[in-house]
Each structure stands twice: as structure tokens, then as C-alpha cells.
Amino acid sequence: MEILNTIESINFTTLFILFIGLKFTIETYLKYRNINSIKQNEGRVPKRFENIVNSEEYKKSTDYNLDRLKFQILVSFVSIFILLLLTLGGLLSWLTQIVLGITSSNILGAILLGFFIIIISEILEIPLAIYSTFVIEEKYGFNKTTKKTFVTDIIKNLIISSVISCSIYAVVIGIIENLGSNWWIFAFGAVFSIQLIIFFLYPVLIMPLFNKFEPLDDEQFKKPIEKLLEKVKFKAKGLFVMNASLRSSHGNAFFTGFGNNKRIVFYDTLLETITPDEMEAILGHELGPVSYTHLSLPTIPQVEFS
């Protein structure tokens, strides 16, 4: 009983504000530490890279990273603003009243409410996306995104986010209505399961909506990669090249999916600028976390969200 009384006496609004404030403070502190570290070494190419990177390229790299870090802090501010606007600002209550005036169905109401929230969030985040793509990325010569691609991406994101989020809301409301006082256990399990399914299907259903993926056929890259994968006993469903040049000149390689659906993806921009030996080194860097089972860590945010 004492525990129950203690729980009932907790001011959850205060806890909510403290949690959000603490999270933002820690993240911002770490970003400022990175900013200060970059500034301390600004203008001085590290000795081990003096024969690889010239001072002009190094300055461009540091300036770009500083701009990105400052932008990330701004994004954190905006995210908190949207969250507080929805909760403490009363926007969520206002939207709920609108939904109640449209339908008496709890499930349909949850779907409409989720859709309204996504629409508002997307609209508020558009200026940030524009600044990131057409100001920062453009400034440093990385942007290749056309206005048409930018708008198309927003529409696709909106549709996909709406379908996934509204489906989750409908499932949770259905569980609340039908499974009694222990609904939260079943809701947690359902949300977590849906997220794992999405994580599994993401590389084969969602990613192809935004980019084209072709099998890696270049033998000078493919052979050393397959040899390295065999050495570390990493089983991938395939090696793919993504048309990242549609949006950016950045080069990258990454893993996606899990279980029997793991894939290795290379940006086409990366293959255009490196040698097979360099590719093997890059992939070795990416494979490192596999040896320490870091690929299972994405499930932690899923648990937190659930």
C-alpha cells in the first residue's frame, strides 16, 4: 500500500519535464564538447593525415562538422518545442476534442489523432529539412537533391509514418478496450513486435521506395568483401549498391536488417572514389560491431519507445 500511495503522489508532469530537460542537457553538453574539441584542433591537420589531407580539405571538413553539430542542437530545441506544445501546451487536448467531434469510435479516433500529430510534426520540421539540405549541404558541395526529390521524399515519409503510427495507435486502443487492467503488458508486446517486424522488412519494403538497389557485380570489390565476410563468419543476404548520388555526394556503407535478412549496402558515390583495398578497410570497420553483437543494440531504443 505504501508503494501505491507513493506512486499516486508522484507528479508525473514534473518527472516528464525533468526527464526531457535532463536528456536535452546531456545531449547538448556532449555536442558542445565535440564543438570545442574540433575548434581546439581547427586549422591543424593531424600528423598521421598530413600526407593524405591538405589544409584546405581539412578546414572544409571541420567547418562542415561544426555547422552540423550546431544544427543538431537547433533540431533538439525544435523537437522539445513540438513535444511540449503537444503535451503541456494543450495542443494534444485540443486535437482530441476535434477528433471527439468527428467520431465516437476510440480506434478511429486514435487513428485520426495520430494522423493529425504526424501532419503537424512534419510541417514544423520542413524548415529544418530545407535548411539542412539546401543551405548546409549545398554550402559544402554535398547536396544533389532536387526540389522535386525533396518534396517527393516528404510525401512518402508522411504516408509511411501515418500508416505505421496510426496502425500502432489502433492496435493499442484495441488492446486497452478488450484486455482489461493488464492491457499495458499486451500493448508493450504488440508495439515491440510491430517495431521488430518493421525493422526486419525495412530493407526490402521501405528503403526501395526511396532509392534503387542493385546487386554489387564488380568483381574487384566483390571478391575481397566476400572473403572478409567469410573470415568473420558474417552471413549477409546480399551485397547491394544504392543510388545515393540521387541526393548527396557523401560516401558510406552500412548494414541493415537483422536475422536472415541482413544486407550490406554501399553508396554508389563510395565505389566511385575508393580502391578495393580501401573498401575492405571500410567494411572491416563496419564489421567490428558485429563481433561485439552491437547489431542487436537497435532493439534497445525499440524497447524504450514501446
Report residues per predicted region.
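Polar-ligand-bearing catalytic/cofactor-coordination segments
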Residues: 3-295, 306
